[in-house]
Amino acid sequence: MQMAYWVMVMMMVGITAPLSEGRKLNDAIRGLVPNDLTPQLLQSLVSRRHRVFHLDNTYLKIPICAWKVCPPTPWRRRDLKKRNK
């Protein structure tokens, strides 16, 4: 949690520091994005997050956790049922 806090603080500093020098907000935000970021590269980064894994002859999507508590994956539930038998 502390890491997320410091990342947020550093991003705020990275945006507000150029503003104090008279730059526009749009230019400051664009300065945080790499110059070689193309729509194709951005699409590949986004699509890479949604991987499909093959497990027990079924295709299961791995949930992407945006919060601290993630929902259990389907095969974990199945493994728990097998263990309890």
Swiss-Prot record:
Q: What is its main location?
A: secreted
Where expressed (tissues)? Expressed by the venom duct.
Output the superkingdom of the source species.
Eukaryota
**According to its UniProt record, where is this protein located?**
Secreted
Q: What does this protein do?
A: Acts as an agonist of neurotensin receptors. It binds to human neurotensin type 1 receptor (NTSR1), rat neurotensin types 1 and 2 receptors (NTSR1/NTSR2) and mouse neurotensin type 3 receptor (SORT1).
Comment text on domains? The cysteine framework is C-C.
Protein's name in the database: Contulakin-Lt2
